[in-house]
Design a protein with these regions (language model features):
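Hydrophobic alpha-helical transmembrane bundles of multi-pass membrane proteins
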Residues: 3-8, 13, 22-319
């Protein structure tokens, strides 16, 4: 009996000792478990969801696009049409109207691809010829990290810029070029002047592509030539206004004066229509300038107020 009790006591002691040993080893397991989330963290970060367009930004860019369309048709057409002689009124209206329609088509065919794809510092590629790969799900970068808009609305917004830029040139040689010559000139100028300038000034991969110094260097190297040099054209001062001004100046110089200039009356057809066109241009410019921010935030509001006040002050100074 004593041997049996001694054996049981020894067995219980060994079980107790092993239990204590297991209890002492147990805290090591949570430590290992605690390491698991840390190891999984990079995987979670890599699996972060892609940015999704905000409905408010998308709605604002849609409205801004419509406003810029109104600048060209009918704003610019009426502005120029009212300034020319009565016999050329319909001609100028049709020139602006058809030039805009033609540029929208050319932009869709190859313009967007040449201006907004990675190629070299001066031209893009034909990777998005006829909007290849541009779908309702594809996105375009803005100026803020994590903020994107649908690429389709970006395509449309930029198309309106191209159209009004070519339309602006029409006024430089109004009444002095045949309709077919105007269309040919605008098609060639759009291809060999507007598109490379747009690529050089505006093309880059967006802020989401920049994560460190190395990626910044890579984005800069792939950007357009003037963008890489630090140029910031917020709303087309270079791509639209300077570009169109140079094209119009050279065109007017090459064609020369109107026949009868300084010898016969060249009274404008209707200053009323010119006033209506100017008013539509002012209204459309809110979409042109504020929409160039590509998102609805305080910077867009600042551009909106600047457009309102600056134009009002210019009007008073002109009066």
């Amino acid at each position: 009996m004593k041997k049996l009790l001694a054996t049981l006591a020894l067995g219980l002691g060994m079980v107790f000792a092993s239990g204590v040993a297991l209890a002492e080893d147990a805290p090591a397991k949570p430590a290992a478990a605690a390491e698991a989330p840390a190891a999984a963290a990079p995987a979670d970060a890599a699996a972060a969801p892609a940015p999704v367009p905000n409905k408010g930004d998308t709605a604002w860019m849609t409205v801004a696009t419509v406003l810029v369309i109104l600048m060209t048709i009918p704003g610019l057409a009426l502005f120029y049409g009212g300034l020319v002689r009565s016999k050329n009124m319909l001609s100028v209206l049709m020139q602006v109207f058809v030039v805009a329609a033609m540029i929208y088509v050319l932009w869709t065919l190859y313009g967007y691809s040449v201006a907004f794809t990675a190629g070299n510092p001066f031209f893009g590629t034909m990777d998005k010829l006829m909007l290849k790969g541009v779908t309702p799900e594809s996105i375009a970068a803005t100026f803020s990290k994590g903020v994107v808009i649908p690429e389709l609305i970006f395509v449309a917004f930029q198309a309106t810029f191209a159209a009004i830029t070519c339309g602006l040139i029409v006024g430089s040689f109004a009444e002095r070029m045949k309709f077919s010559a105007v269309l040919l000139f605008c098609a060639l100028w759009f291809t060999f002047s507007y598109l490379p300038i747009a690529h050089m000034v505006w093309y880059w991969d967006g802020p989401d592509a920049i994560t460190d110094a190395a990626s910044l260097e890579k984005v800069t190297a792939a950007a357009g030539w003037l963008w890489a040099k630090g140029a910031l054209d917020f709303a087309g001062g270079t791509v639209v206004h300077i570009n169109a001004a140079v094209g119009g100046l050279i065109g007017a110089y090459m064609i020369g004066k109107r026949i009868g200039y300084g010898k016969e009356s060249m009274a404008p057809h209707s200053l009323t229509l010119t006033m209506v066109g100017a008013a539509l241009l002012w209204v459309g410019w809110f979409g042109f300038n504020a929409g160039s921010n590509l998102e609805a935030n305080g910077v867009a509001a600042l551009a909106f107020v600047n457009t309102l006040v600056a134009t009002a002050m210019a009007t008073l100074a002109w009066i």
